[in-house]
Amino acid sequence: WETCKEFLKLSQLEIPQDGTSALRESSPEESHALRKKYGGFMKRYGGFMKKMDELYPQEPEEEAPAEILAKRYGGFMKKDAEEEEDALASSSDLLKELLGPGETETAAAPRGRDDEDVSKSHGGFMRALKGSPQLAQEAKMLQKRYGGFMRRVGRPEWWMDYQKRYGGFLKRFADSLPSDEEGESYS
């Protein structure tokens, strides 16, 4: 039914006989208000936007969403909004508590008291800790480890297993197998 009603509204708009749009003939105050409301888009889409504004007036929900939600849902959404604000406030308080007193202002500046604090430097490397061994152990577990590749020294374990399994079969009979160096080939 809504689409039919909209179609009737559109068909009832009067279009002047001279071919100009009735929407463009407006007072300068209205055009100034529309330019202020829509900005630079009025140059290109002005007539369309004005027509849409007439057909679909702005709903009161867009003007005051919190009040409408409170009325519509009986305060349910209002409670959620208040809880989100409380959560943001508590998280910022927690962050301030973790940073400690006086460090919120100087968080971006480099610190001079490395021996007192656990501080990060250069992309996540933890500096050495001086203090309780328990705190040092916890920080070591969290420490990021970046570095070079590990280099294997000696034979790999799978090679030893391979030698045990085949009992050195290839070593025993390596002399009796034809080699490519001797030039012997089977045709």
From Swiss-Prot:
The record's family statement is:
Belongs to the opioid neuropeptide precursor family.
Basic and acidic residues composition bias: residue spans: 111-120
The chain residues annotated with the modification Phosphoserine are S187
Q: Which organism is it from?
A: Felis catus (Cat)
Low complexity compositional bias, start-end: 88-99
Q: For this UniProt entry, what's an example GO CC term?
A: plasma membrane
Q: Which residues form the propeptide?
A: 52-70, 80-143, 153-163, 173-187
Which residues are marked as site: Cleavage?
M49, K50, K51, A70, K71, M150, R151, R152, G154, R155
Q: Where is this region: Disordered?
A: 81-132
* A molecular-function term among this protein's GO annotations: opioid peptide activity
Chief site of localization: cytoplasm
Q: Which UniProt keywords apply?
A: Cleavage on pair of basic residues, Cytoplasmic vesicle, Disulfide bond, Endorphin, Neuropeptide, Opioid peptide, Phosphoprotein, Secreted
Q: How is it modified after translation?
A: The N-terminal domain contains 6 conserved cysteines thought to be involved in disulfide bonding and/or processing.
Tell me the protein's name.
Proenkephalin-A
InterPro entries assigned to the protein according to its UniProt record, in alphabetical order: Opioid_neupept (IPR006024), Proenkphlin_A (IPR000703)
User: Its Gene Ontology biological processes?
Assistant: chemical synaptic transmission; neuropeptide signaling pathway; sensory perception
Annotated localization:
Cytoplasmic vesicle, Secretory vesicle, Chromaffin granule lumen; Secreted
